[in-house]
Amino acid sequence: MGSSEEQSVPGDDFYEESGDLNTGLSLVLRPAKSNEGESSLSSPKGSKLTLVSQLEASENPSVVLWAGEYCPDSLVPEEERVGSPMDEKVVGLDFLSQPSVETTATGQQVTNLETKGAREHPSPESVCAETEAGSIRRAPQASEEAKFAASAGTFFPKGLEQSRSWVTPRKSTTSRMVIGENVHHPTSEPEPLDELNEVQMMRVTICLKDGNHGNQAKNSGPAETGDLARHSNVQTRDSFMRMPSSLLVSTTRGLTSGVERQASKEPEPFSSKKKQGTLWGKGGSKSSYPEAAAGIGALPKASPRKKMAQKKKPLWDASAVTLGRAFHQWGQRLKSAPAEPATFPPISGVGLPGRSNKCSLLPLRPKQCKNLYTGKRSGAKKTKELQLVAKEDTDSTRDPSSQVQFPTHRAEPPCQSVHQEFNSGDINARSLQDAGNSQSSALNQRGIMSKKSVLSGDQEEPVGLPAPDSEILQLPGTQGCPRCPELQKEIEDLRKQLSALQAVSEKFQTHLS
């Protein structure tokens, strides 16, 4: 076979086209038994390719993949096969595994595929594929058909209307193909027609791209038919493969890891076009590779989360704007119209708005408010005044003439002032102190304090001192005094006032404590 020539087997449309080593598929001769009636083809390296001579009777051959050691080993004598309508062709392919394609899934569901194909077609064509990684031979797996599809070469269909299945080979890929007539599939009994329903038509589309060559695997179309001669390819008449759904799953697993490795080496723009794998199984169900999902994700289609975020975002923005404007304007109105200070004229006894009203308008509270500042000082002054009054009382008891000389006009004004202060509700300690400074007020308070000491039993005064009023009544010469009834009335009034003052002072002390 020349480097640019195309040689085909007559009657089968199974031809091979080889080109350069970088773009073509190198064929290595596999040791096979030579029999009569075999023809050989030369590969680019000078090796021979043995072909079966009985390929003329095939009308619609179907390709059935056999994994590794599951190729049938039972040999049927060639004499029995000559001239029979069930002429068969077994193609044994050994391929070096590509580093980028790994098959890990295990499956052995393809043992009966060839017999089912033979049941449907009078002249089936079985292909036996086995993979080798270096010198180590892996266990037969159902996913090795995927490796065969990934490393064998680029498969192009004859008709554009048929399905596609191709693979671009790597530069370092070397493969050997041997077609011999010594290997036959085992004869099997006819199977019931009910079992044929389990195997359905599946369209396999495998697109793999090798980053070293820069060759891009594309769907074949009218514009791409001119590039078929540049690549070595193996074309078959029947582009459909009979595969069960279990083999579909294993093939998907085998191709996933290799495609993921190649995806890391290629730029992102080509990933959505180059690496797309779709498998059609039972009922038209479609399972895609992660790269296909990545290609779909690259399209300008928003994810559901983004859609939800876009739906929620305008609502949130609108609410935020409306709320922000409302509260902002409300705050500005408060700031633009501050509360003006009160312009009322100052009134005594009425507190201005905004100021702490420490003193209430009750009649007894003003004294308490003023005593808040005097506090202990007023109490100390009162004790001193009591002591002075006690001394004056002792002096008055010794001097009886001073008791007779009490002027009535001087004693009346303090009483009237005390009544007025009680009526107005503005009693001051200072007014009492000022009244005590004058002579008349001192005399009146002396009598008041003496009565207070008698009623309350104050211990500050010396014990055993008689009351001054009783002494005044007992003085010799005062019994017939016309002023005695008036003085007694004043004494009664003073006692009443004293009791009132005492109650006020007790309340004040309890308030301070």
From Swiss-Prot:
The modification Phosphoserine is found at S43, S84, S123. Keywords: Phosphoprotein. Residues 37-48 have a biased composition (Polar residues). It comes from the Eukaryota. Residues 1-48, 210-229, 236-287, 390-414, 453-481 are annotated as: Disordered. The keyword Chloroplast does not apply. The keyword Disulfide bond does not apply. InterPro entries: DUF4641. PANTHER family: GENE 4779-RELATED (PTHR31866), PTHR31866:SF4. This is Uncharacterized protein CXorf49 homolog. It comes from Mus musculus.
